[in-house]
Regions:
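Sec-dependent N-terminal signal peptides
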Residues: 4-15
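Hydrophobic pocket/interface hotspot
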Residues: 34, 44-46, 53, 68, ...
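A short gly/proline-enriched turn/hairpin at secondary-structure junctions
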Residues: 48-64, 71-77, 109
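Solvent-exposed loop/turn segments at secondary-structure junctions
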Residues: 52-53, 61-62, 103-106, 140-144
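A short acidic/glycine-rich loop-to-helix N-cap element
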Residues: 110-115, 144-150
Length: 154
């Protein structure tokens, strides 16, 4: 048994990338699937942690506490694409950070349309029940683009 543990430990040291194999790809696939859902259904997917999340939004304003049910975002239309997604795995199979650009146009229900939405996104993700969930987000407008006008959930 001791020999087996030493061999396994040695393999991990020699090839630590095996530990994170698939996490990056799974996260990118899930982010794109959640975005496709939002575009098709004009509302966001179930993507938040059971512990909720903290967020800074592209509109500026103060930090927002998001409940586990997520943000109740609904849109008259939503034509946003995620681009240049990069993932940093912090703890294999448990925690990661995703960074990407969110670009397009949208009209949230009850709010003005945003014709050139262009933001940088950083999200802290945790794996819950086999699915990567949002635990923290920071959205900041890129020069020449704009964020939303929403500053609170209420």
């Amino acid at each position: 048994m001791k020999k087996l543990l030493l061999i396994l430990f040695g393999l991990i040291i020699i090839n630590p990338a095996q530990l994170i194999a698939g996490d990056k790809e799974d996260i990118i696939k899930q982010l794109l699937a959640n975005n496709a859902y939002a575009k098709k259904n004009n509302q966001t997917a179930d993507e938040y942690s059971a512990n909720g999340a903290l967020e800074f939004w592209s509109s500026g304003g103060l930090m927002q506490k998001i409940e586990p049910a997520g943000r109740p975002d609904k849109y008259d239309y939503m034509k946003i694409d995620f681009k240049h997604i990069e993932v940093i795995v912090l703890v294999p199979k448990k925690a990661a950070v995703a960074m990407y650009y969110s670009e397009g146009s949208m009209k949230p229900e009850g709010a003005p349309a945003v014709s050139h939405y262009l933001t940088r996104v950083t999200q802290g993700l945790v794996k819950e029940g086999g699915t990567w969930k949002i635990r923290a987000s920071h959205w900041s407008p890129v020069s020449g683009g704009s964020g939303t006008t929403q500053t609170t959930l209420n």
